């Protein structure tokens, strides 16, 4: 399990942390409107994400205070969004 790829339609979702994995969010359609990311290292609110500008690459799930299992919350108003959780390489 080096990568987990999911496709989301407009709505609200939780993406659970996998130890040692990064989180990338990529617009599958031309644009994803109203993207909000909370509980991640890099958070955004009501952002426009396009497939021409990879703004959502290499994030990390940080979670919220008091959580037993860490997750990030994502929501968006239109478009389709790919999430890619990739095992981070630590040995060079």
Regions picked out by a protein language model, each given a short descriptive name:
Residues 2, 7-92:
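Long, charged alpha-helical interface segments
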């Amino acid at each position: 399990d080096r990568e987990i790829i999911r496709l989301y339609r407009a709505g609200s979702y939780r993406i659970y942390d996998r130890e040692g994995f990064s989180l990338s969010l990529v617009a599958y359609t031309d644009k994803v409107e109203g993207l909000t990311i909370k509980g991640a290292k890099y958070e955004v609110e009501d952002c426009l994400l396009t497939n021409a500008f990879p703004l959502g690459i290499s994030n990390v799930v940080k979670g919220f205070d008091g959580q037993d299992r860490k997750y990030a919350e994502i929501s968006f108003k239109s478009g389709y969004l790919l999430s890619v959780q990739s095992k981070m390489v630590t040995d060079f």
